[in-house]
Amino acid sequence: MTVIVLAALLAGAAAAAAAVMLVGDDDGRAPEIAATGASEPLSGPEVRFSGSDVTTGEAVGLGKLEGKPVVVTVWASWCAACPEQAEPLRRFVAANDRVAVLAVDTQEDAEAARAFLTANDLGLPTIADEDGHIAAKLGVRELPTTLFLTSDHQVASMWEGPAGIGRLKSAALAAARAG
């Protein structure tokens, strides 16, 4: 009996480890595993949030992006993996005008967000989420996290860990087609 229970526990741990290894693995293929480890993309209620851009002070948020699919990237300057997402985001923004990109810098102030944007040459509209409220509302468990929203701002999929250019393109295309 003990052997069977131990074998079952080990099998469950191995399956969980395999799912975790898939999160953040970006080989350029279409997303197959959502952040939950499920094979189906996430879907849910319409996402809404807004704030002031850390660079310009202008109001930004999903309300200003009605009718357009949106990539929302959630990061922080203290996150070791977050700079890995900068180059793919720059390339994605430069090659794309049909999908909006909005950044949320979480659990730090606007000054830290501006420094990160400057250091990583990112010209993205960015909201400072100092208390982590927006990240919590979005279900963020790990940084960076990227959400792909349909044109009616439903969550089409979510990716935990740095997303490469292939992942950004394929998931954004899927979100655009879904809504």
Language-model-detected regions and their locations in the chain:
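N-terminal targeting signals for export/organelle localization
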Residues: 1-48, 179
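A short beta-strand-turn-helix
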Residues: 41-43, 48-70
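Short active-site neighborhood of thiol/selenol oxidoreductases, capturing the structured segment around
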Residues: 60-83, 89, 101
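Conserved N-terminal glycine/acidic-rich loop preference
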Residues: 65-69, 113, 122-124
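Structural microenvironment flanking redox-active thiols in thiol-disulfide oxidoreductases
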Residues: 83-120, 130-137
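Thiol/disulfide oxidoreductase modules built on the thioredoxin-like
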Residues: 115-122, 130-179
